[in-house]
């Protein structure tokens, strides 16, 4: 089902919800509408429905329960990275131990929000979209360099691969970090995984 939230001032945010509990789905939908965001919400409850919706609904953000009857958030994230690699993925779950949450974040999930305290959901979505806007502010060449830096290639190797000077690569790298507001390579790698530019190395 697709649900829209009333608000005529902005283009609606397309939210794909992977959830097999209808009561929980209603609570999440209510929280999104309560926040004042204008949304177009589509709900699916299976791997097949999720894959189809990624192609037909083309979501701006994905919200996923951690564990469904025959599907889970890790499998869903893998499918998402194949079909819409840069779309934000936020886990909204009833219960997740810290170790599982950490694994999900390292795998590329944007955040983990507990159903018992969904007041942070709006901020999680806003932060995810802000991260993507900064990515879209980079040039195609800068994204090439970002991928290679995040994948662990040294400056000299990147220059050789792209047919550019070392000085040019250093300039690109400096500008990338400035635009993304990132100050070290470790954080840059995490960002690249988070926005789907490189696969997670678990």
Model regions and ranges:
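Recognition helix of helix-turn-helix DNA-binding domains
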Residues: 154-187
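Acidic, metal-coordinating helix/loop segments flanking the phosphotransfer/catalytic sites
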Residues: 29, 43-61, 71
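Conserved acidic segment of CheY-like receiver
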Residues: 10-23, 28-32, 43, 62, ...
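Alpha4 helix (beta4-alpha4-beta5 surface) of REC/receiver domains from two-component response regulators
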Residues: 74-75, 82, 95-112
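C-terminal output helix
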Residues: 97-103, 113-126, 161
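The C-terminal output helix
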Residues: 126-137, 199
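Short amphipathic alpha-helix used as the core "switch/output" element in two-component signaling
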Residues: 33, 52, 67, 72-86
């Amino acid at each position: 089902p697709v649900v829209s939230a009333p608000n005529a001032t902005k283009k609606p945010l397309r939210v794909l919800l992977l959830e097999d509990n209808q009561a929980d789905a209603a609570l999440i939908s209510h929280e999104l509408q309560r926040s004042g965001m204008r949304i177009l919400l589509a709900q699916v409850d299976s791997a097949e429905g999720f894959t189809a919706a990624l192609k037909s609904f083309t979501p701006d953000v994905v919200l996923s329960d951690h564990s469904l009857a025959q599907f889970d958030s890790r499998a869903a994230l893998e499918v998402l990275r194949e079909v819409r690699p840069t779309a934000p993925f936020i886990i909204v779950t009833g219960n997740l131990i810290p170790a599982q949450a950490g694994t999900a974040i390292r795998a590329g999930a944007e955040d983990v929000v507990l159903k018992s305290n969904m007041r942070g959901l709006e901020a999680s979505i806003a932060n995810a979209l802000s991260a993507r806007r900064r990515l879209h502010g980079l040039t195609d060449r800068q994204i090439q360099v970002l991928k290679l830096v995040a994948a662990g290639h040294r400056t000299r190797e990147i220059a050789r691969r792209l047919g550019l000077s070392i000085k040019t690569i250093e300039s690109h790298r400096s500008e990338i970090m400035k635009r993304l507001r990132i100050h070290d390579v470790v954080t840059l790698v995490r960002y690249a995984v988070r926005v789907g530019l490189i696969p997670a190395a678990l």
